[in-house]
């Protein structure tokens, strides 16, 4: 009986080890290799693996996705929540938003933001968007490896939204959660 229990435990440990084996992920958009040269002269490749703590499979997004966009931290996000000159936009898809978001955020998915610039103070005209009355937008998605908000911000700028009115919270929900800050279910 003891042998049977030992064999079962050994097999379950082996299965568990295989199931949590890390998946290699890109660090940045292209397949670039980063190498650190140690004091001994040994070269050590820097890798990124999908582990239980690495929640997203994307790749690191630049701190400033486009020239003119202002990067912000949690402090600026907290200050923007009740500031009438700002709108906090969760640029993730509706399923992510409905699960949890930052209090006070509205959901404009990254795939829709260019069609909904009127909600951000722009006027639709025959020649395109007039964004002279645009509000300040704090945009975020799932975190440093999430491409959704940078994609949305590029589309906003392409369609006439002023880059200097876009504030990018690159840390997104990953950092917000890691810091233990309050979240709410998204309200449509």
Residues of each region from the PLM?
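Mid-length scaffold segments of soluble, non-membrane domains
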Residues: 70-136
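A mature extracytoplasmic/lumenal domain signature
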Residues: 92-95, 101, 112, 141-143, ...
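Active-site neighborhoods of enzymes that stabilize oxyanions during catalysis
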Residues: 179-188
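Catalytic cysteine-centered active loop of the rhodanese-like fold, especially the PTP/DSP P-loop
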Residues: 121-176
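Bacterial N-terminal signal peptides
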Residues: 6-15
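Flexible, polar/low-complexity N-terminal or interdomain linker segments that lie immediately upstream
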Residues: 17-99
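Positively charged n-region of N-terminal signal peptides that target proteins for export
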Residues: 1-4
């Amino acid at each position: 009986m003891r042998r049977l229990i030992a064999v079962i435990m050994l097999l379950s440990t082996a299965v568990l080890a295989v199931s949590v084996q890390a998946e290699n992920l890109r660090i940045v958009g292209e397949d670039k290799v980063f190498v650190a040269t140690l004091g001994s002269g040994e070269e050590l490749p820097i890798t990124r693996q999908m582990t239980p703590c690495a929640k997203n499979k994307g790749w690191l997004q630049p701190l400033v996705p486009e020239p003119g966009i202002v990067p912000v931290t949690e402090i600026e996000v907290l200050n923007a929540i009740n500031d009438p000159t700002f709108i906090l936009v969760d640029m993730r898809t509706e399923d992510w938003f409905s699960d949890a978001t930052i209090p006070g955020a509205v959901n404009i998915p990254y795939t829709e933001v260019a069609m909904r610039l009127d909600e951000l103070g722009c006027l639709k005209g025959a020649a395109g968007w007039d964004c002279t009355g645009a509000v300040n937008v704090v945009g975020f998605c799932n975190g440093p490896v999430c491409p959704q908000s940078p994609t949305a911000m590029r589309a906003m700028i392409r369609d006439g939204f002023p880059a200097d009115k876009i504030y990018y919270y690159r840390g997104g929900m990953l950092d917000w959660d890691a810091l233990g800050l309050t979240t709410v279910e998204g309200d449509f």
